[in-house]
Regions:
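N-terminal positive-inside, membrane-proximal cytosolic segments immediately preceding the first
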Residues: 2-41
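Short solvent-exposed coil/turn linkers within tandem alpha-helical repeat scaffolds
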Residues: 102-112, 126, 139-147, 174-181, ...
Length: 230
């Protein structure tokens, strides 16, 4: 298809329009030099502040990770020190304080949630059930929601609040197949037993067995089914 013919008059007119438009822009900048300069400075300041904030957050995150590593070392030492209960308790206390320090430095994102989970683990090891539950609750909406729900279930179970424990175990029991689903089902079954609801406990153990036929818990599950059937 042939292109549209452009007249000589149009060719002569277009440079004039460009020059006129350019002139208007130049005049605007000249007449509004101070506001334009001010707006430019503001934009640069905002960009610089954003870059500095990003750099600072990255530095905070790195510092928190370093503290986390120290805390994890203490936590592992405490977990392996069951032969000396007093020393173990002291180590869990130190680990908890380190994780709290890491969270204070950087409490956002995955790094912050890892700190919270381990703060909860330390409280749990120290039998500080309410504090453990509170820490785990901070992670129910994040990437570690399955860990948090299961851990809250254990916390309420340790307190003897089986209805609340069952509610949190149920989150994982209703989830996708995997380790947390099996743990969730086992937790639900234990809670039904504790609440003297044996038919529901039996049904849950049977469900766990059906969903995880190759689990290393098969012998235990078969025994529980046999026991509850009487």
């Amino acid at each position: 298809m042939a292109g549209k013919k452009i007249t000589r008059k149009q060719l002569l007119k277009e440079p004039d329009e460009f020059i006129t438009t350019t002139g208007r822009v130049v005049r605007f900048l000249q007449e509004n030099r101070r506001p334009v300069t001010l707006y430019g400075i503001i934009v640069l300041a905002v960009l610089a502040a954003g870059f500095l904030a990003y750099s600072y957050f990255r530095w905070e995150e790195g510092k928190a990770l370093t503290i986390q590593q120290q805390a994890l070392q203490l936590f592992q030492e405490a977990s392996a020190g069951a032969e000396n209960p007093d020393k173990q308790k002291e180590s869990f206390q130190k680990a908890k304080e380190k994780f709290q320090e890491a969270y204070k430095v950087y409490g956002r994102g995955t790094v912050g949630q890892i700190s919270q989970i381990y703060i909860g683990n330390c409280h749990y090891a120290l039998k500080e059930w309410d504090a453990a539950i509170q820490a785990y609750a901070q992670c129910l909406d994040g990437p570690f929601r399955a860990v948090a729900a299961q851990s809250m279930g254990y916390g309420y179970e340790a307190k003897g609040e089986f209805a609340k424990a069952l509610e949190h175990f149920q989150r994982n029991a209703d989830g996708e197949a995997g380790a947390y689903q099996e743990e969730g089902l086992l937790g639900v079954a234990r809670c039904y037993e504790a609440l003297n609801q044996k038919p529901k406990a039996l049904e849950t153990y049977q469900k766990a067995l059906a969903k995880n036929p190759k689990s290393n818990m098969v012998d235990f599950l078969q025994w529980k089914v046999s026991e509850l059937k009487g």
